[in-house]
């Protein structure tokens, strides 16, 4: 396992031994000079940009906040991502989210009833996801179904997509895409997140293995101004105000 250097901090009230366990599990090496910090608080794990403290911490929260509001009051099956993966009455596809990020769309699909496996290659992001899942699994309201439907695999999609079994009906891709200079007021969360992971410059290499794994379709989320992934025109798209969900058919030959 290659190691990632990041400042590791523990606040008052946090389990004093948890930080070293976290570092060992995810292959993290503490660097006091690093701009990015992974902070263990009494409640959760947070990512912070030390030179911009006003941005606050980034963390995964499936129980409260925007995710809970989206689950309770969002568009449900009418949400663009739900339409794009093909959810309809009597059909809930199994989904591999191959670029999980902070798990937002994966959680929406799981809340609607899909079995979703998240893949995340960055160990810091995987640690944040794992912490959010751990807290979510313990929640009395969402824990029982979350444990059944939403799981995490820390691996690179470029290699893992070849080996996943059983094959999902849908592979979902949402690679990090550079923001246009005009949109300087990128949400604070994205500024912190992009400082850590940067752009997914190898994302074009995901489309072919994703289409070879999915038995039905691949869905690629793109900003409205972005070209298609790998320059391959989509078969269809679900379009929102600022994004589109490009849809590609599986390249798997169905059995005769």
UniProtKB/Swiss-Prot annotation:
Q: Which reaction does it catalyse?
A: guanosine(1516) in 16S rRNA + S-adenosyl-L-methionine = N(2)-methylguanosine(1516) in 16S rRNA + S-adenosyl-L-homocysteine + H(+)
Gene3D superfamilies associated with the record:
Vaccinia Virus protein VP39, YhiQ-like domain
Give coiled-coil spans as residue ranges. Answer: none
Enzyme class comes to: transferase
Q: What is its EC number?
A: 2.1.1.242
* Top-rank lineage group of the source organism: Bacteria
- Which is one GO molecular function term here? rRNA (guanine-N2-)-methyltransferase activity
Q: Name one Pfam family in it.
A: SAM_MT
* Annotated residues for binding of S-adenosyl-L-methionine: 104-105, 120-121, 156-157, 174
Q: Which InterPro entries match?
A: 16SrRNA_methylTrfase_J (IPR007536), SAM-dependent_MTases_sf (IPR029063)
Record NCBIfam families: PRK10742.1
Q: What does this protein do?
A: Specifically methylates the guanosine in position 1516 of 16S rRNA.
Protein's UniProt name: Ribosomal RNA small subunit methyltransferase J
